[in-house]
Structure formats: C-alpha cells, structure tokens
Amino acid sequence: MLGPTLVTDRLILRPPEAIDFEPWAAFMLDEESAKFVGGLTPAPTTWRGLRSMIGCWAADGFGMFSVIERASGQWVGRLGPWSPFGWPGKEVGWGIARAHLGKGYATEGAAASIDWAIDHLGWTDIIHCIDPANTPSEGVAKRLGSVNRGPGQMPPPFENAPINVWGQSPAEWKARKR
C-alpha cells in the first residue's frame, strides 16, 4: 500500500487500489454522484483517473483516499487531500456515492483527512473547491469550520466550472476542535 490507513468511528480511509475500479466507475457513471466532481465519466476515462490518483500517492505521498464503510466493507466514495497542478490551493475534497449520502461520511472522512494533512503533510492552509449550486457540500464545509472565501478559478479543462473556495488555516481548525 502506498500510504496510511486512517480509521474513524465508521470509516476506513486507505489509498485507492485497482480493486476499487468497479465501484469508482459506478460512482462516476451516476449522474447525481458525478454532478460536481467532473460530471458523468465513461469507464475508460475513470480507469485512467483512478490510476492517476494511485499515481498521486506514488509521486506525492498523498492523494484522495478510498472510503470504506467499516460495518459492511463496502466502497462508499473517495475523499482526502490533493493538490493538482493549477488548482487554487491544497484541497481536501470529497465525493460520496449516492446510496451513502446523508450519513455524515463526507464530514467524518474529511475531518480525519484534514488532521492528517496538517499533522503529516504540514499543510498551512486547507481549501475545498465547491460549486455554488452544491449546497450539501457547502454544508459539509461549514460543519468542518471552513468559510467561503469567494469565487475561485479552476485550471483547464474545468476553467468554466463555477466554484467558491472554502477554507481554513490549521490554527482555525485546531481552535474549532477544542
């Protein structure tokens, strides 16, 4: 395995593996799930995307985690730290499969990822790039203690996607947790 495994009350966060392809592809073929994470994506493109995320772990020592529900062992999404070239900052992002929305998994997993990014990667700022129409993700950001910093610009091919940059510093994160 290329990185750590983080365990929360209900989740296991681990670097993605080739065995995650089928649920990851189903996630990216579900219109509701994929709406704010690049849109519907055919399986061959998702295959390359999954391999790219695995490559982030190999090249950078971090990337999105696969999210596994502890009770069932089921893949329920992907989330975590990443910082693609041209991105507005170092992001902890999330995407949870439709069947598992509303369970608090994004907040629980993102909180563990923020802790790890601050403590192990030394990140000095954490952002979340959120489409203004994605009110559920805005709710996650608020629960995490992040604030809306205003509009941001994504790199190609997402340059026309509207986003607001939400974020906080490690000091703000740690103060909120007290």
Q: What residue ranges belong to the model's regions?
A:
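Extracellular/periplasmic catalytic domains that process cell-envelope and extracellular macromolecules
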Residues: A58
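Conserved GNAT-fold acetyl-CoA-binding loop/helix
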Residues: E32-S52
